[in-house]
Swiss-Prot record:
Keyword terms of this UniProt record: Isoprene biosynthesis, Magnesium, Metal-binding, Thiamine biosynthesis, Thiamine pyrophosphate, Transferase
InterPro entries in the cross-refs: Dxylulose-5-P_synthase, THDP-binding, Transketo_C/PFOR_II, Transketolase-like_Pyr-bd, Transketolase_BS, Transketolase_C, Transketolase_CS
Cofactor note: Binds 1 Mg(2+) ion per subunit.
Binding-site residues, thiamine diphosphate: 72, 113-115, 145-146, 174, 287, 370
GO cellular component: cytosol
Cofactor(s) named in the record: Mg(2+); thiamine diphosphate
Protein name as catalogued: 1-deoxy-D-xylulose-5-phosphate synthase
Pfam families listed in its UniProt record: DXP_synthase_N, Transket_pyr, Transketolase_C
HAMAP family, sorted: DXP_synth (MF_00315)
Molecular function as annotated in GO: 1-deoxy-D-xylulose-5-phosphate synthase activity; magnesium ion binding; thiamine pyrophosphate binding
Lineage: Bacteria, Bacillati, Cyanobacteriota, Cyanophyceae, Oscillatoriophycideae
UniProt source species: Rippkaea orientalis (strain PCC 8801 / RF-1)
Length: 636
């Protein structure tokens, strides 16, 4: 059977092991071809092909429910649920999402983007099933490091106290998240999986017996039984721990052996109460380069499938903001042993792997544990250290109480460096970083800044590291800088709460924040062509806002525009409007940013165009709002 003929996962039921293996081969081929062309998450999906096929071969997906953790594991799931023919549109505008979306397929039973959510959602479904007198199966597939997250452990703790609630948890144990897993739980699983001396003895016992007189090869069947018994002894320790938590335990089993997977899943489905199936997989399975470099091939930009090398850009690009951040912070840390970089399992993405390589004693990876990362930073700050929490904007949401309760209320000097702030592109709504201004600005003691370019990023890093009057946050975007020269030394901190005038004009005041400052300058040049001269201000800080600069300019010029790459509700424009209201500055104000809606997956440029945030669109709207009697429309 060709996988393109599979439009429903129940079609797997009648297939032989050989046919299922052929389906697995086709899934891997499509997966590799698509990611090589479009970019996206490569390693996670390759590791769960057989797991997905075997699980769905034992379920009735017209009734049964499956929740997937960190949805980039679910690419094989998407192909088996009627999306194979459109899989080439993965992460493209109007195409298939890179994560699970309930609105995309009836088989996406729960949306997933962030880690450690699957067991909680599945348990909720199981309890709803029982309350309504139904009897379908509910399965949570968790892995790629997500079991290190506290939320997953909270769900296991709850489920283990419900002995009559049928729930299956499948642990996809590939020893990895994005980077190698850290922490005691991961280390314990790895001991069971790889290094137990009893397991080693079982694996080598038969070879030793072959060298003894009278035995030779004659004991093979008996030896297999001995080996299996010893292996069961080897894994009984982790099984005992899981069963102490209230779960029946199966495993670990070979995550790439369809026969073993199907047999184990069928047994596990018969269990009353919660059950955990421990599946050992290889991240990147089937693509040798990804198996050897599981961190590098977790996610890829478009690449050459034969060589594994990224397809070069048609023209050289400036360094990414993450790369500039990593270089600058590492340089500062070399001269300041109190600087400690903290990441929550995102060392490569944030650039902190560079700090780890050069100054490992000044680097901490807490695993998928954002709440712990923030309070840990608070403890470090209490004792005079300079903690720098490098985290994606979307993931800091997960530690909001810790930011407020543990850091801001105590006014501790923790430096939050929020990567991927603003519009992130192909990862879509679950990963957009457009809410941080709003959710941080309302917290007392918090200072918030954003650089207009990569050189100003360097100065803001110096500012944050040297700021000791309380917590401070810096937001910066995904992707490359705009190409301004970088400084290798002589960095000076910025004055807190002070912006700068970049361009003078008497007809309009444009206040830009962060990445939108460059857009403001471009829009101002377009307006000049229509006889309109604008003053452009780089605000730098949204809190404290530079009212000493902004308010007199607003009163003198009389027309004000704000630009931000973030949500309008509670954002930079709202801060300006509040300042105008508080100081009785009665001037017309037009705010540009992200309205009260979700932003789907697309390229950042496509999303900005959809939101009316390109410089031509902004200039057009300014003309319509403030100068409609002066010039005809420029944009069709």
């Amino acid at each position: 059977m060709h996988i393109s003929d599979i439009t429903h996962p129940n079609q797997l039921h009648g297939l032989s092991i050989r046919q299922l293996e052929d389906v697995a081969r086709q899934i891997r081929e499509k997966h590799l071809q698509t990611i090589a062309a479009t970019g996206g998450h490569l390693g996670p999906g390759l590791g769960v092909v057989e797991l997905t096929i075997a699980l769905y071969q034992t379920l009735d997906l017209d009734r049964d429910k499956v929740t997937w953790d960190v949805g980039h594991q679910a690419y094989p799931h998407k192909m088996l649920t009627g999306r194979y023919k459109n899989f080439h549109t993965l992460r493209q505008k109007d195409g298939i999402a890179g994560y699970l979306k309930r609105c995309e397929s009836k088989f996406d039973h729960f949306g997933a983007g962030h880690a450690s959510t699957s067991i909680s959602a599945a348990l909720g479904m199981a309890l709803a099933r029982d309350a309504q007198g139904e009897d379908y199966k509910v399965v949570a597939v968790i892995g790629d490091g997500a079991l290190t997250g506290g939320m997953a452990l909270e769900a296991i703790n709850h489920a283990g106290h419900l002995p009559h609630t049928n729930l299956m948890v499948v642990l996809n144990d590939n020893e990895m998240s994005i980077s190698p897993n850290v922490g005691a739980i991961s280390r314990y699983l790895n001991k069971v999986r790889l290094s137990d001396p009893v397991q080693f003895l079982a694996d080598n016992l038969e070879e030793q017996f072959k060298h003894l007189p009278f035995f030779g090869d004659s004991l093979s069947p008996e030896m297999e039984r001995v080996k299996e018994g010893m292996k069961r002894l080897a894994v009984s320790k982790v099984g005992a721990v899981i069963e102490e938590l209230g779960f029946k335990y199966f495993g670990p089993i070979d995550g790439h052996n369809l026969q073993e997977l199907i047999s184990t899943f069928k047994q596990a489905h018969k269990v009353t109460g919660p059950v955990l199936v421990h599946v050992a997989t290889v991240k990147g399975k089937g693509y040798e380069l990804a198996e050897k470099d599981q961190v590098g091939y977790h996610a890829q930009s478009p690449f050459n499938l034969a060589t594994g090398k990224a397809i070069p850009s048609s023209k050289p690009k400036p360094p990414s903001y993450a790369k500039v951040f990593a270089h600058t912070l590492t340089t500062l840390a070399e001269n300041n042993p109190k600087i400690i970089g903290i990441t929550a399992a995102m060392a490569t993405g944030t650039g902190l792997d560079k700090l780890q390589a050069k100054l490992p004693k000044q680097y901490i990876d807490v695993g998928i544990a954002e709440q712990h990362a923030v309070t840990l930073a608070g403890g470090l700050a209490c004792e005079g250290m300079r903690p720098v929490v490098a985290i994606y904007s979307t993931f800091l949401q997960r530690a909001y109480d810790q930011v407020l309760h543990d850091v801001c209320i105590q006014n501790l000097p923790v430096f939050f460096c929020m990567d991927r702030a603003g519009i992130v592109g192909a990862d879509g709504p679950t990963h957009q970083g457009m809410y941080d201004i709003a959710y941080l600005r309302c917290i007392p003691n918090m200072t918030i800044m954003a650089p207009k370019d990569e050189a100003e990023l360097q100065r803001m890093i110096v500012t944050g590291v040297n700021y000791t009057d309380g917590p401070i946050a810096m937001r910066y975007p995904r992707g490359n800088g705009i190409g301004v020269p970088l400084m290798e030394e002589g960095w000076e901190p910025l004055p807190i709460g002070k912006g700068e005038i970049l361009r003078n004009g008497d007809d309009l005041l444009i206040l830009g924040y962060g990445t939108m400052v460059n857009t403001a300058l471009q829009a101002a040049e377009t307006l000049r062509e229509h006889g309109i001269e604008a003053t452009v201000v780089n605000a730098r800080f949204v809190k404290p806002l530079d009212t000493e600069l902004i308010l007199p300019l607003a009163q003198r010029i009389g027309k004000v525009v704000t630009l931000e790459e973030g949500c309008l509700m509670g954002g930079f424009g709202s801060a300006v409007a509040e300042a105008f209201s508080d100081h009785n500055v009665l001037v017309p104000l037009k705010r540009f940013g992200v309205p009260d809606r979700l932003v789907d997956h697309a390229t950042p440029d496509q999303s900005k165009a959809d939101l009316g945030l390109t410089s031509p669109q902004i200039a057009e709207q300014i003309l319509q709002v403030f100068f409609s009697n002066r010039q005809p429309s420029m944009v069709s």
